[in-house]
Amino acid sequence: MSKLVISKERMYDVVRAPVITEKATMGSEFRQVTFKVPLDATKSEIKAAVEGIFGVKVTAVNTLIAKGKVKRFRGRPGVRSDVKKAVVTLAEGHSIDVTTGV
């Protein structure tokens, strides 16, 4: 499989923010880091972006879409936006410190 080439601008569009939750930080024991990504991002784009921005080797990318909840605002129902997350597994010996700025 050929390596996907994307622009620097698209890399920073794909990796929006790290997810800092108890469940996401438990994945660090298994060399996993979780990021928020756009709904149209593909696994190969996510892999290329993480490798390009952080300079690490990615072995796997798993994605999930969390559906937006129905909430009420001023008595009227509304829907929160859907959120796509990517769980990125890094190669042996590689790590990303998400607590520091990029």
From Swiss-Prot:
Gene3D superfamilies xref list: 3.30.70.330
Biological process according to GO: translation
Cross-referenced InterPro entries: Nucleotide-bd_a/b_plait_sf, Ribosomal_uL23-like, Ribosomal_uL23/eL15/eS24_sf, Ribosomal_uL23_CS
Residue ranges that the Swiss-Prot or TrEMBL entry lists as coiled coil: none
Top-level division of the source organism's lineage: Bacteria
One annotated Gene Ontology cellular component of this protein: ribonucleoprotein complex
PROSITE patterns: RIBOSOMAL_L23
Gene Ontology MF terms in the entry: rRNA binding; structural constituent of ribosome
UniProt keywords, alphabetically: Ribonucleoprotein, Ribosomal protein, RNA-binding, rRNA-binding
Pfam families assigned: Ribosomal_L23
Job description of the protein: One of the early assembly proteins it binds 23S rRNA. One of the proteins that surrounds the polypeptide exit tunnel on the outside of the ribosome. Forms the main docking site for trigger factor binding to the ribosome.
Family the UniProt entry places it in: Belongs to the universal ribosomal protein uL23 family.
Quaternary organization: Part of the 50S ribosomal subunit. Contacts protein L29, and trigger factor when it is bound to the ribosome.
UniProt name for this protein: Large ribosomal subunit protein uL23
Origin species: Paramagnetospirillum magneticum (strain ATCC 700264 / AMB-1)
Lineage: Bacteria, Pseudomonadati, Pseudomonadota, Alphaproteobacteria, Rhodospirillales
